[in-house]
Amino acid sequence: MAKASVELTRELQDSIRRCLSQGAVLQQHRVKLETKPKKFEDRVLALTSWRLHLFPLKVPAKVESSFNVLEIRAFNTLSQNQILVETERGVVSMRLPSAESVDQVTRHVSSALSKVCPGPGCLIRRGNADTPEGPRDTSPNSETSTSTTHSVCGGFSETYAALCDYNGLHCREEVQWDVDTIYHAEDNREFNLLDFSHLESRDLALMVAALAYNQWFTKLYCKDLRLGSEVLEQVLHTLSKSGSLEELVLDNAGLKTDFVQKLAGVFGENGSCVLHALTLSHNPIEDKGFLSLSQQLLCFPAGLTKLCLAKTAVSPRGLQALGQTFGANPAFASSLRYLDLSKNPGLLATDEANALYSFLAQPNALVHLDLSGTDCAVDLLLGALLHGCCSHLTYLNLARNSCSHRKGREAPPAFKQFFSSAYTLSHVNLSATRLPLEALRALLQGLSLNSHLSDLHLDLSSCELRSAGAQALQEQLGAVTCIGSLDLSDNGFDSDLLTLVPALGKNKSLKHLFLGKNFNVKAKTLEEILHKLVQLIQEEDCSLQSLSVADSRLKLRTSILINALGSNTCLAKVDLSGNGMEDIGAKMLSKALQINSSLRTILWDRNNTSALGFLDIARALESNHTLRFMSFPVSDISQAYRSAPERTEDVWQKIQWCLVRNNHSQTCPQEQAFRLQQGLVTSSAEQMLQRLCGRVQEEVRALRLCPLEPVQDELLYARDLIKDAKNSRALFPSLCELGHVLANDGPVRQRLESVASEVSKAVDKELQVILESMVSLTQELCPVAMRVAEGHNKMLSNVAERVTVPRNFIRGALLEQAGQDIQNKLDEVKLSVVTYLTNSIVDEILQELYHSHKSLARHLTQLRTLSDPPGGAGPGQDPSSRGRGRSHDHEETDDELGTNIDTMAIKKQKRCRKIRPVSAFISGSPQDMESQLGSLGIPPGWFSGLGSSQPTASGSWEGLSELPTHGYKLRHQTQGRPRPPRTTPPGPGRPSVPVPGPRQENGMATRLDEGLEDFFSRRVMDESSSYPRTLRTMRPGPSEPPLPALQKRRRRGLFHFRRPRSFKGDRGPGSPTAGLLLPPPPPPPPTQESPPSPDPPSLGNNSSPCWSPEEESSLLPGFGGARGSSFCRKMGTERLEAGDGAPAPGTAQPPRVHGVALPGLGRTKGWSFDGKREGTDPDQEDSTQAWQKRRSSDDAGPGAWKPPPPPQSSKPSFSAMRRAEATWHIAEESAPNHSCQSPSPASQDGEEEKDGALFPERMVPARNAKEPPIGPRPPKPVAVPRGRRAPQVPGGREEAESSSAAPGANKPWLRLGSQQDQEEPEGQVPSDLGRRTAPLKPKRTRRAQSCDKLEPDRRRPPDPAGVCAGTSEPGTD
């Protein structure tokens, strides 16, 4: 600050400073102010940054007048110490005390003006030419400097402050700080009014006005912000003054027609205007503004490079003027690169569009063309583009237009010609454009002929392609190699996706696929489509990198696709938004993320996900280190936050923390990838290898004594193959370990270490050179300061010690960051190599083992033929049976392993192992999933085999049929419908078709709408479950009376499988009647509407129960389900002769057959065979018994019986369930049918059954061994089926009849399976031959007592009312 005049007192100076507290007082001078001509008065001149103040010589000081430097029109120095200032309000003349004071005032005003209006040269000249000018300081920090090259953002802050002072407004320091700090740090030359939208309109106007004098900013941007009239006036002022503003963006700023007219006038006034990009979209400028702007654009010598006039309410008349301007000004043909006229309906619908078409047909430089929503005729436009835009056009948006304004089915030739001739297209948008089939074919044919394009994004969404379009895509898309991204959303493909999805997979150039809003199909078809999609992304050569099924409303079936993401290695981005998959979908997604290592981006929202679903995702991301981005699910998060705000906030913060962690380079868990790949590679073919090795070993042992040399050579080769097969088990881990050992000190790491050392040396050398150069330059600029230093060398060494780069940092950056990324990629490649080698070797071993097995089996057959006597059949052997046996042996060789070891089947099974099975909460039954997954190569029983805890027979060869070698047979879709009962038994030549019974995966209740969509296409329940079951050997006698007409109609009814409400009771383990089934109640009257009680077949057979063909097909593999007709023929006589004794040793128990609860008919409580609701005790509601109740209530369907599970020693917790579900056995031969009433509580309660129902034998659970024995009770009559002979004991009928008259006929009937027990009489026949009684309760066996000891809580006093007269001991577990 200059020194104040000597005449000014200290008190006056302080008073002036206090008066101008808002601005710092830079100078104070005592002057003579000319108030009248030749009359001067004393005043004080105070100078601030942007204003000159005049004060009288009074205390306290008060401003008499002031003016801003921007008000100065002329500043003249009339004499050595007199100045004349001409302002907007008048002329001010004053004398200063000395020439030095005049010079100080002049330099201050000149510096202020140069900051506001930067420019070269001196702004103030002295009026007297004889007086030489003093020396001017042009240093950057001097007050008289006019250089603005070193000012921040072109001095915007100073200009803005001066304008605020000029207009008398407060200067916003936040504006100055933002510009000087943020804009300067980003080197941003775009002034965005949205950054200051929170300020008032007058403040925005001053910022825009400051741009008129600023040379730093080149772009003014404002979008979606309505600007006031003050701001718009300053925009026009800025455009009229600025010589540096190149781009103006006023998108949706509330502009009117008059503004555009004024803007056109401004362009004409400013000859130095350099504007080349103009955006006025979403403003109603209408035709008047369009015409004015078009006329002014004719005068642009350089034209425009970008013009955006989208949604401006322009008519074809305005477009015609604009097109004529483009054609009249030749500069536009070479300068215009970006043209957007979209969202103007009807703009190109008339003949006025020919002016624009003419411009487009000429050679031009257009790169981006957007004409969406303009009613453009696509065929005419493509004809114009074919001549003028093929060489440069990269973006073409023709959405929401019509293909042609003419009616006709012929494809326009422009489609094929343009798309085959374009050189640089990268984005084509034809969405919501109704393309005829011929146009679509022409488009695809043109792209298939184009060899210049690659990675083209083609948007065909909402084009209503439907079936015809899907067919065209299937035919033409395979030959198109330039499409990298294809959007087929919302095209109504629906069921056509079954064939379209595999066709899309054949295009290996396709990287991004969008299929949303195309799944409006039934549940069964939807699942098939999703499985096709799963098959597509699971292909080894799949090229897809991103997949979108957004807004498809897949709901819970989204999990079918999610389950395939776990082991998927091709997809990096997936969009699952808008599918309503709920929390169960989030849980399935979390399981996939735990093992996936390829996904980088997941988009999911609008899925009804709660905080629990997000919690599952957060837990999954803890073990996922590769997912980088997850879109913020606004809809689901807001909904979850309303219900659980704290949990939702914590979970989302955890998700974000995991994503931030994953975005940093780090080590990927290779051990997890190794274990996952090992399970998928080795376990797929390991079982086949083991079985083949076992069979070949048996054949080698059988042929080891054969003296023939060729046979011995094959045996030696077979032994070598077996050895290789055993070694192949360790092939995968050994190769992985070898790669890991070699990688520790491999050439890559050695090279990285050497590079780190070289980089460290290079960094040191570079720093040395830089420091020496900097010190030398500093010495030249500031030699005195450098001389003060102790010496050049010492300063250099001190600086070098401070700016050195540590070697550990360089080594860590190369080895731990970049090197780790390289190592992760190297590990992925090594794992793929190991997988390929292992698969190749295992496939070769399987083929060779199979060929060896076939050859050795052929030798065995020849030896058996030679060893047979030439006389034919031996004694007691039927020649036909022996021939059948030989043919069966030969069939075993081919049928058990299939016609060949199909490696494709193994690959399909491996692919299926990569897909997680569908959750039981989602799927109705595993059988439905198996039938729908046939095209994927999933063997029958695969899902049930994965979810079953039952062990399979490892020594059985029936499991080899799990690898299918040919397609599935066609099956009638309606054969599962309920049918009326057949009166004629099927002939021996008509085989029974096995029908798998419906089961559920985890016993949970199905949804209410489950099964409604595919009701008429799948079997709801077994036919035999609707009626009382009979043994296979039982046939109703001819004397059986026919059923009533009402009952026949009910049985033939479609909904005969429905149960009455009384079946919904729950039979818990502690129920009073859980272990005792009462005798049948009396027959009902004709008006009773209860269906016949479904009774289970006998379980007392010691060899195998007499299953019906439907029941045999429903068994699990290894438990009789795959034995076939030969096993039934072999076991037929044994079943009839074995009786009801205990099971023979080594005989497998039948497994539990799980049933599926029908919609609305699932049992929430227990039900009994006699149809009576059974209650439960309050003390049964513990966790274990509740789980058993769910299993027992959901595993059995209506009318389904429950065979016992595996032996008690393996699953002791199920003993109570088995005893509760045991049934009675009928032991005696039935006499003529007599309806008997039983004095049971069931009959007293009014429970009734229909006459003529057939009741097989029933079983009663064993009581506790510690209870006192119950004395013999008189036998009670039971209903027995007619036409059935009782099983014969070894003693014959005479022995049985003789024992019937002996005393002690009420002796319990034992079922121990021994010869002694078999010789005992089975029951006492009473004197009344018209009645037959059931046997008494048997003695307790050790195994039954051991079963009781496992559950002591079942012990309770017996119920004498529920004990029948005679019982039969069921087969022990």
UniProtKB/Swiss-Prot annotation:
Widely expressed, with much higher levels in fetal tissues than in adult ones. Highly expressed in newborn brain. LRR repeats lie at residues 242-269, 272-299, 333-358, 390-417, 422-446, 453-475, 480-507, 510-536, 541-564, 568-591. Residues 1007-1022, 1218-1228, 1345-1358 have a biased composition (Basic and acidic residues). Residues 981-997, 1078-1097, 1269-1278 have a biased composition (Pro residues). Residues 138-151, 1098-1108 have a biased composition (Low complexity). It is found in: Cytoplasm; Cell membrane. The keyword Membrane applies. It comes from the Eukaryota. Residues 1047-1062 have a biased composition (Basic residues). The keyword Repeat applies. Pfam families: Carm_PH (PF17888), CARMIL_C (PF16000), LRR_6 (PF13516). Residues 126-151, 864-902, 970-1373 are annotated as: Disordered. One of its GO terms (cellular component) is postsynapse. Its main location: cytoplasm. This is Capping protein, Arp2/3 and myosin-I linker protein 3. It comes from Rattus norvegicus (Rat).
